[in-house]
């Protein structure tokens, strides 16, 4: 999942940059949305990992 979130962020950066260079506001907005989605996935994955680690420590 980490790779997926990083890819979404990268894809968003590319779309946003291309949209900015070509003055395509719709593509630029799509890129911004992709970046937010990628960052949200990353935050959820990090939280999931921390919770899993905490549960594992409690089991020991």
UniProtKB/Swiss-Prot annotation:
InterPro entries: CsbD, UPF0337_stress_rsp, YjbJ_sf. This is UPF0337 protein SAUSA300_1582. It comes from the Bacteria. Gene3D superfamilies: YjbJ. Belongs to the UPF0337 (CsbD) family. Pfam families: CsbD. Coiled coil: none annotated.
